[in-house]
Amino acid sequence: MSDELKHIAIVMDGNGRWAKKRGLPRSMGHKEGLNTVKRITKAVSDLGIPYITLYIFSTENWKRTEAEVGFLMGLIKQHLKAELKFYADNNIRIEHIGNLSGLPQDIQDEINSVRDKTSAYTGTAIVLGINYGAHDEILRAIKKLNSDELASINEESFSLKLDTGKIPPVDLLIRTGGEKRLSNFLLWQSAYAELYFTDTLWPDWTVENLYEAIEDYKKRNRRYGNA
């Protein structure tokens, strides 16, 4: 296996706490978090890293207040519409993982529209985890299998049934905000990922912080089970 960095995944944690520290509503933290998304994805694109997957909205996030969920859905839709020029200027294409059918119809339509409009771009792919949970993803993949496939299934063929399909496994998984857990994010794809945890809240995370995480990754010895 190559140690070349092909796929970064990020659990973007800390928006709410960032806002609370400043006496602001949680919504302001989410808005500020989008600014971080733009600068980090631009940096990843400039570095020529093929994939970055962002944990935008989990299957568990529906447990939040109706007002916050509604705000987040609106923010996602607004962001996708507003950034088409950014994607074009940077040759970025958008992909989606998660249970698309479980999202409001207007969000489904916007995701499909942006995915179609950016599909010809050949640079970095931003993979948006929206209504995503690894357990849900794996269960949906199992349900796609017919009896013949089930009898001959192996790791490679099962991987293709997952939302990520042919996207390479995660090399570096970053979590901001101080927590040290995966939170049901890309469990199958992160089997051999290097984990990087930082106390910095997502809205405060900088391009320099990204470079530090990548430099730390480069120093790791990835053995993949070997001695």
Swiss-Prot record:
Q: Which keywords does UniProt give here? A: Magnesium, Metal-binding, Transferase
Name of the top EC class for this enzyme = transferase
Cofactor or coenzyme needed:
Mg(2+)
Kindly identify the residues recorded as the active site. Answer: D13, N61
One Gene Ontology MF term? ditrans,polycis-polyprenyl diphosphate synthase [(2E,6E)-farnesyl diphosphate specific] activity
Tell me the superkingdom of the source: Bacteria
Give me the comment on cofactor binding. Answer: Binds 2 magnesium ions per subunit.
Residues annotated to bind substrate: 14-18, 26, 30, 58-60, 62, 64, 175, 181-183
Q: Is RNA-binding included in the keywords of this UniProt record?
A: no
EC number(s) per entry: 2.5.1.-
Q: Family assignment?
A: Belongs to the UPP synthase family.
Q: This protein is called what? A: Isoprenyl transferase
Q: What is the gene name?
A: uppS
